[in-house]
Every structure is written in C-alpha cells, then in structure tokens.
Amino acid sequence: MSIRRHWLSLRLPLVLLLWGWVMVWSTVSGRLDLLLRAVYHPVVAIGGVLLMLIGALQMRVVLRGQAVRGQEVRVASQPLPRGWLLVVATAVALLLLPPRPSFNDLAVSRPSALPEAPRLAFVLPPEQRTLTEWVRLLRTQPDPSLHTGAPVSISGFVFQRPGETPQLARLMVRCCLADATPSGLPVQWPRDFTPSIDAWLQIKGTMVEETINGEVRNAVKPSEIKAIPRPARPLEP
C-alpha cells in the first residue's frame, strides 16, 4: 500500500479520534460550561468516548489489514464527505480557541420568559435569593410595595437592550445557549459608575421602588458594587 493510499485509509479513523477527543476534552476542561447545561455534560463525554473507540477500532482494521468474512476491509473505500477538511479545521479551532460568547448579545436577541420556579426559592431569606429567584418572585408577586426595603445580594452580567438602562442579568437554559433566556433586574446605578456591557458584577443593596413611564416597579439600589470574574458555570437551569 503506497503512503498516499495508506493516509487516505486513515482519514476517517483520525477524524473520529479527533472529534472524540474534542468532546471529551471540552467536558473535562470546563468549556462546555459556557455552552451547555451541566446535566448534559456526561452525554457529550460518553459520545466522545464512543467516537474514539470507533476510530481506534477502524484504525486497527486499517493497520493490521484485518479481513472480515474473507474480504479485506478497506476504509479507503468509504470516502469522507467533501467537507472533511472543514470538519478537521473546526475541531482544531475548538481545541485552540476557547469559546468567548457575548452574553449580552445573546440575551438581547432572546425573549425574557422564565420557566416555572421552585417554590422553595420564594421562602428563602431575601439576601439569599439569587438574581433569577428575585426575577421569578417579582413576576409572581408584582406588587412593588411587598419587596421594598428587602436586602439584595446578587451577581450577574451587565445586560442592556437598545434604548433601555443597563440591568444585571443571568442566562437561563433548558439545554444549551440556543434556548437561553435572559432574566434581568433593573439597577439604579450610581452617577459616578458606568457599567460595562458583559462585565460580571456582584451587587449588594436594597430593593426600592421607581417609576418608569408611569409604571411603578422594583429596582436594586446598590450599596456595594464589585467586579468579579465570570463564574465557571455562568448558565443557570
């Protein structure tokens, strides 16, 4: 078998091994935390292991010239799709270039609708509620007077829709970023503080009332604003 023919025979096994490794490594390295809900990470890892096993078995067949039912198995007779180079380039890019999604850009393009909330979240002390739990509570109990003066301790990224004041938000996902839903809280930003879009902040303060276009709503009045690194798992279920 010539070197060229030998290489052609190994293309499919190598591609399977490469993509299997990408899936397993993305799970172990934590990159999937930026793209996929944690409960689905084992599915990706198992899929990667299976791809690597299939690739290894096919490579063994090619290298040993194993015969099946009296006929030599030739992986070269199973041509890869014409875009196989693109498939390989994509896998290499995923290994070399970590994902850096803009949560603000994604949130702007998504509707602000939240799934049903666990009832336990509503009975937590106010200072223990997450940003998402606060949003759910305000939607189920929209009377601003019920929450005015409550202590708040939340974290999230700065999110701004066109023409609106920046909010502090988190992304909710059922599966992955494709079905992400933003949940945001209005913030009365100090005059001497300009929030940077997509920046992650931790805010401590109190819940107050404000009137916007004749509508009374709750907003967070910060007493402390602290820049924080993006969480290892920024997506919330």
Located regions from the model:
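OB-fold and OB-like beta-barrel modules that bind single-stranded nucleic acids
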Residues: 152-158, 198-207
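Short aromatic-glycine-enriched beta-strand elements
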Residues: 163-173, 216-218
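OB-fold/S1-family single-stranded nucleic acid-binding modules
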Residues: 212-236
